[in-house]
Amino acid sequence: MTALQPYTIPSQDDRQSVLADKIKRLREERNAIILAHYYTVPEIQQVADVVGDSLALARAAETTDADVIVFAGVYFMGETAKILNPGKTVLMPDNSAGCPLADSCPADRFRSFREQYPDALVISYINSTAEIKAESDIICTSSNAVDIVSQIPSDKRIIFGPDRNLGSYVMQQLEREMILWQGFCYVHESYSWDVIETAVRQFPDAQLIAHPECRREVLDHADFVGSTGALLAYSQKSPADAFIVATEPGILYEMKKRSPEKSFIAAPKDIVSSQSVCSQMKQNTMENLCNCLETMAPQIVVDETLAAGALKSIRKMLEMSK
């Protein structure tokens, strides 16, 4: 296995600087706000107005007074922003940037699954389609899943989907059973303890921090488990000088930016598993971000009836996580 190296912030070339200036000008002209997830490339994060995890970005989308929302993320995120702001223009740099986790839970199959447990409350991860959100009672994110489930009476059955690893983590934290949909994020599923242990041996003083979408075998060895936002906050306040980070490596940019004196090592992936980079997030580029502001396309459109159903479960999440 190739020796791992701590993350360094990449330099910005002249073309990226020119694009950044043009994006900033177009943003002012359009009265737009640019929201970007931590997993996007550093250049995107540098020009964004808000960089955050799913919950932070949903809140930013809900409260903005901008006329145009540009969402650099994957499709369900732009869709959520449109559901929260039906009267605003919502753009995505590339609306073909989907989420395999969300796609692993088709609405018709999930509906049939739900019908097997008619008395169950449905809590769905925000990494899901508008159709699934409309089928759900409450939405959650990785940062508030434990808190939201903890507010449900212990005698109430819960269906949790689509991420089985996040669901399993919530079950372990609260010592309660839930009925899990068997979906997963291919990035986080790619981490195994056998491989990460090699990084731990290479960096014995580093803390292992992991996202709850990782498998249990990884979480059981982690010094801290949390959403991307929580991992970022922990890396800032922890006295540790080095961290092995088991989540999509886009977060390393913000970690290094906030704590330049610390070392951040992307956790190695299982060599027999899928890649540990979210290729869909990387479809957001400076070129297509600039182009979407220039052409005001592609725009996100959500059916009004579907949006109304999905809005109820999203609003419930926001109410329960204040």
Curated annotation (Swiss-Prot):
Main location class: cytoplasm
Coiled-coil parts of chain: none
Annotated positions binding [4Fe-4S] cluster: C99, C185, C278
A GO cellular component entry from the record: cytosol
Keyword Repeat (UniProt): no
Location in or out of the cell: Cytoplasm
Cysteines engaged in disulfide bonds, as pairs: none
Cofactor names: [4Fe-4S] cluster
Swiss-Prot/TrEMBL GO biological process terms: 'de novo' NAD biosynthetic process from L-aspartate
Binding site for iminosuccinate: H37, S54, Y125, I126, N127, S142, H211, P212, E213, T228
InterPro entries: NadA (IPR003473), NadA_sf (IPR036094), Quinolinate_synth_type2 (IPR023066)
Sorted UniProt keywords: 4Fe-4S, Cytoplasm, Iron, Iron-sulfur, Metal-binding, Pyridine nucleotide biosynthesis, Transferase
Cofactor detail note: Binds 1 [4Fe-4S] cluster per subunit.
NCBIfam families: nadA (TIGR00550), PRK09375.1-2 (NF006878)
Family the UniProt entry places it in: Belongs to the quinolinate synthase family. Type 2 subfamily.
Protein purpose: Catalyzes the condensation of iminoaspartate with dihydroxyacetone phosphate to form quinolinate.
Protein name as annotated: Quinolinate synthase
Gene designation: nadA
